[in-house]
Amino acid sequence: MSLADSVLAINNDLPIRTDSPVHSGKVRSVYWLTDADSRRLITTKGYNVPEDTPLAIMVISDRISAFDCIFHGEGGLKGIPGKGAALNAISNHWFKLFAENGLADSHILDIPHPFVWIVQKARPIKVEAICRQYITGSMWRAYSKGERVFCGITLPEGLEKAQKLPELLITPSTKGILTGIPGVPAQDDVNISRSDIEANYQAFGFEKLSDIDLYEKLLKDGFKVISKALADIDQVFVDTKFEFGYVTDKDGNSKLIYMDEVGTPDSSRIWDGAAYRDGKILENSKEGFRQFLLNHFPDPDVLLNKDRMPEREALARDNDLPLEAMMQVSRTYTGVAEKVTGAPIPLPANPKADIIKILKDEYDLIV
């Protein structure tokens, strides 16, 4: 079987029983189960949620997105070998560590396969919860242009690129396009301040004003747990994005939980510790792939300028990236996952067939 066959690039065509359209994101696809199947699994599998909780099968792919586009490689390679399994393995590890440290639950109820989560439906907070320990990326770009207020936070003078910040900073942005919020443009990923959230907390999906404090605590506490664990394997946790939502527990109480993935090379910047001490930046995250793209194409402005999206989409669609570049990303992702979890990352030869078999034999969800 070829390398291309081992990559799960299309994940929205599985014959999973559902009565709703499949939701396809950049990397994951979500299959909402029927009410009958949700109730059956909650009962037979003993999931600790109310019997009427809607459940979904969330299937990760090996696709790689950057600058809001999906890229592909030579030889029909439509994704990164091992990427999906690596991302799930890392998130699974951190969620387990969060539970051990008494933090909030996640939306995951079951892990039938390295590419698959069974999740409970949550009511999402419409905030990209971003936490930064070092100044880089968009914060550095703004700072280097003379801006000293970022997401409502005043930054001190004299900071240098990649320097550790005086304290852990929360710099949220909008999740999706939100309309009708004073002072917040109706665009995706717009930087916002805590005061923006406080003044419009219900529009951002918070049920109580005090839950803003809770989300910030869960974000910082989760960041610190991951940062300490990464430091133990000489990796630097630079910055990350978390997502949060509400679920209803068995007693009918609403509670805030972690959603999506946490602490992965897709959602975070991770630097090699030894290289950083030598004054160098060695990326162990998707940031390395972004830098490759900026150097690979002759006009990097296409990738950075939001006004040139049609050109960017054509660039991603019409160019096969070098195989070695794709495999370097594979080595980065699987390498980080193996360091974090202490176990090899399984690379099934035919992941789609494996997923269908497990969901049929063990969950009776295949039509």
Curated annotation (Swiss-Prot):
GO BP annotations, alphabetical order: 'de novo' IMP biosynthetic process
Catalytic reaction list: 5-amino-1-(5-phospho-D-ribosyl)imidazole-4-carboxylate + L-aspartate + ATP = (2S)-2-[5-amino-1-(5-phospho-beta-D-ribosyl)imidazole-4-carboxamido]succinate + ADP + phosphate + 2 H(+)
CDD domains cross-referenced by the UniProt entry: SAICAR_synt_Sc
Molecular function terms, GO-annotated: ATP binding; phosphoribosylaminoimidazolesuccinocarboxamide synthase activity
A GO CC annotation given for this chain: cytoplasm
SUPFAM superfamilies membership: SAICAR synthase-like (SSF56104)
E.C. code: 6.3.2.6
Stored InterPro entries: SAICAR_synt/ADE2_N, SAICAR_synthase_Vibrio-typ, SAICAR_synthetase_CS
Keyword ATP-binding: yes
Keywords: ATP-binding, Ligase, Nucleotide-binding, Purine biosynthesis
Pathway membership: Purine metabolism; IMP biosynthesis via de novo pathway; 5-amino-1-(5-phospho-D-ribosyl)imidazole-4-carboxamide from 5-amino-1-(5-phospho-D-ribosyl)imidazole-4-carboxylate: step 1/2
Similarity-based family: Belongs to the SAICAR synthetase family.
HAMAP family: SAICAR_synth
Protein's name in the database: Phosphoribosylaminoimidazole-succinocarboxamide synthase
